[in-house]
Amino acid sequence: GCFGIHFRSRNFFMWTNKVISNRRAAKGIIFGDQGLFIKREVFYEAGMFPEIPIMEDYQFSLTLRDMGVATVMTENTLLVSDRRYRGSTIRKLMVMKHMANLRKRYRAGEDPVKLFEEYPDIR
């Protein structure tokens, strides 16, 4: 399972990001910033996180879904940093679009090493 997320920001686009992220998690696609929790046996049975530089949490969620593992999202939420989205509204939209594009390309089979080269690792 995972926790829902929220941002301290009152920006409409951050609220939208939260809604989309929580909706996706409710459908079984969980990202690392959502505080994934899982039984040890299931973690090992799923092959643990793949050794790839990006999308390892996404791939793990896809694997769990393919295995038929049901995921839940708690009513509790995690406060997630918005630092990768800081700046103007245009910047927020550009980052959101870029991240969605990286996921789409990953699903299409593009090499995660190549995708990682384009990842804005802002931490």
Task: Locate the predicted segments by residue.
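Short, well-ordered alpha-helical scaffold segment located
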Residues: 41-45, 77, 84
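Residues that recognize and position ribonucleotide moieties
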Residues: 29, 36, 71-72
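Short beta-strand-to-loop element that shapes/binds the nucleotide-sugar donor at the catalytic cleft/hinge
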Residues: 1-13, 79
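Short, glycine-/aromatic-enriched active-site segment of Class I SAM-dependent methyltransferases
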Residues: 15-26
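Catalytic donor-sugar/metal-binding loop of nucleotide-sugar-dependent glycosyltransferases
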Residues: 50-52, 62-79
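Conserved glycosyltransferase catalytic-site signature
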Residues: 36, 54-61
